[in-house]
Regions:
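Structural/interface elements that position substrates and couple domains in central-metabolism enzymes
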Residues: 1-299
Length: 299
């Protein structure tokens, strides 16, 4: 029912929670953004966040429009940072440089910061793809263009295709008839979220060319079964996934994949090809165990 005498306020209070760390982010936020039009709305929201007062959490008061754009702008900036370091990783591949050392070298600059300078197969999840596209749409509706954000989106799509080529090259130019173990399916660790995960693009591309995929993920396999082709063999652990494999791919950096027994791994594989799309391992350590190693921006 319509109540023309209803007394209310409108406010915007965007969340900045990370999947897998939502409780910690809620309890100890970097800042709280409140977009309000009235003193009453501001007073109410400040009261809601009063428990954070002792932590001296900054509360940023803005207009409603600014608060809404702040959410999109934050995620678009982080997505752009990821796309930037991914493109630098490709350049490092071409020149023989080490992107991990490069990231440390620029990340120690206080103007840049070390966070989100970790190259990989591209960003995914529910936030970055959605929010970058939403920001682009807002710009278009208001007669503006966001060329940097647009380039970040395009670079992210290209990164996934580059990873397919990297895998193919490590297999001698063709994945047809090759068995590939994929460790990690979700877009990031500590979640079962498969939305826009790089695996959703990369695995079908490999299957299309005749690869056999054996996969493992601590939390994402149930969801993966709904989204990925039915020919994938899902396994109980990393070593089962790698049994008879020509290559193993670290797709998602779950902690359990950071401490693999490389000797055991090599003993069950058909070929010892290690493709580290998250740069989890030191290349020399893997090579010492008899593997051919390929990372992203380092080899």
């Amino acid at each position: 029912e319509v109540n023309p005498e209803a007394d209310f306020d409108i406010a915007s209070n965007p969340e900045f929670l990370r999947e897998g760390a939502a409780i910690a982010d809620f309890m100890r936020p970097d800042r709280v953004v409140i977009g309000v039009e009235t003193d009453r709305a501001e007073t109410l929201l400040r009261a809601v966040y009063q428990p954070l007062y002792l932590q001296e959490t900054p509360i940023v008061k803005t207009s409603i429009e600014t608060a809404e754009l702040t959410k999109y702008a934050a995620n678009a900036f982080l997505a752009t940072k990821i796309s930037f370091i991914n493109e630098m990783a490709l350049l490092c591949d071409a020149t023989g440089a080490d992107v991990v050392a490069l990231a440390r070298g620029i990340g120690m600059d206080g103007r840049i910061g070390a966070k989100f300078l970790h190259p990989g197969p591209g960003y995914g999840g529910s936030c970055f793809p959605k929010d970058t596209m939403a920001l682009m749409r807002i710009a278009q509706e208001n007669g503006e263009s966001l060329r940097v954000v647009e380039a970040a989106i395009e670079a992210n799509g290209a990164q996934k295709a580059k990873m397919v080529k990297k895998i193919r090259d490590m297999l001698g130019g063709s994945e047809a008839g090759k068995t590939i173990a994929v460790l990690g399916l979700t877009f990031k660790p500590e979640t079962d979220d498969m939305r826009d995960s790089p695996s959703i693009t990369i695995i079908p591309a490999l299957l299309e060319k005749g690869a056999v995929i054996r996969a493992h993920d601590p939390q994402g396999m149930e969801e993966a079964r709904q989204l990925l082709p039915g020919t994938i063999v899902y396994t109980n652990n990393s070593y089962e996934a790698c049994t008879g494999a020509d290559a193993v791919i670290i797709m998602t950096e779950w902690n359990q994949y950071r401490a693999l027994d490389l000797e055991r791994l090599g003993s069950v594989m058909k070929q010892k090809i290690f493709i580290d799309l998250r740069n989890v391992y030191q290349p020399d350590l893997v090579k010492e165990k008899g593997f051919r190693y390929e990372g992203v921006g380092r080899s």
